[in-house]
Amino acid sequence: MGTAKEKKQQIVAEFKDKLSRAQTVIFSNFSGLTVEDDTILRRKFREANSEYKVYKNTLMTIAAKELGYGDDLIKYFEGPTSVAFGYDDPVAPAKVLVEFMKDHKGIELKAGLVNGKLVTVEEIKALAELPSREELVAKALGSMKAPITNLVFVLSGTLRSLLYALNAVKEKKQAEA
C-alpha cells in the first residue's frame, strides 16, 4: 500500500485528468444534503452519463494550479465542495443539478467550467435551460426528415392525379366504343 503522499498525488492526477477531459465541470456546496439526498443525486448523475464526486479543496487547488487555472477558479474551493463532470453532453450536469435544486435546498452552485472557461452560477442555470444533445439530434433529424416526407406526399399526389386522369380517359374511350 502506498504512502499518504502517493495517494494524494494519485488523487491530484485523477482530478486533473477528469478536469481536462470534461466538457463541463460544476462546483457546488453540498453541506446541506442528507446522505439520502446525496445518494439520489449521485444516481441522477449516473443516469445522465455524468460523474459527481467530492475532493479535498487543497488537492483540487494543486491540480487546478498545475493545469494553469488561477485564483479566479481556486477561490471557489472553500467549504464543502462537490464536483460534477460532464464528458459527452455539456448540458447534462447543469440540468441534473439545477433540477435537483428545485426540490432540495441543501445544495448550492458555486461556479463551473465549460470547455475550460470559467462560468458563473447564472451561466450554469442558463446552460441547464438548453436542450440536451439527444434533443438537438432529434430536432435536427426531424427537420431533415420533414422536406423528404413532404416531397413523397407531393410526388404521390401527382402520381395519383395522373392515374385518375388516365382512368378517366380510359373510361371515356370505353364509353365511346
UniProtKB/Swiss-Prot annotation:
The record's annotation in InterPro entries points to:
Ribosomal_uL10, Ribosomal_uL10-like_sf, Ribosomal_uL10_bac, Ribosomal_uL10_bac_type, Ribosomal_uL10_CS_bac
Q: Name one Pfam family in it.
A: Ribosomal_L10
- Which GO BP annotation is one of this protein's? translation
Identify the GO cellular component terms for this protein. Answer: large ribosomal subunit
The protein's matches in SUPFAM superfamilies, at most eight in alphabetical order, are given as: Ribosomal protein L10-like (SSF160369)
Task: Kindly state which keywords UniProt assigns to this record, in alphabetical order.
Answer: Ribonucleoprotein, Ribosomal protein, RNA-binding, rRNA-binding
MF terms (GO), sorted A to Z: large ribosomal subunit rRNA binding; structural constituent of ribosome
Q: Which domain of life is it from?
A: Bacteria
Its biological purpose = Forms part of the ribosomal stalk, playing a central role in the interaction of the ribosome with GTP-bound translation factors.
Question: Which family does this protein fall into?
Answer: Belongs to the universal ribosomal protein uL10 family.
**PANTHER family found in the cross-reference section:** 39S RIBOSOMAL PROTEIN L10, MITOCHONDRIAL
NCBIfam families xrefs: PRK00099.1-1 (NF000955)
The record describes its quaternary structure and partners as: Part of the ribosomal stalk of the 50S ribosomal subunit. The N-terminus interacts with L11 and the large rRNA to form the base of the stalk. The C-terminus forms an elongated spine to which L12 dimers bind in a sequential fashion forming a multimeric L10(L12)X complex.
Question: What is the name of the protein in this document?
Answer: Large ribosomal subunit protein uL10
Native source species: Thermoanaerobacter sp. (strain X514)
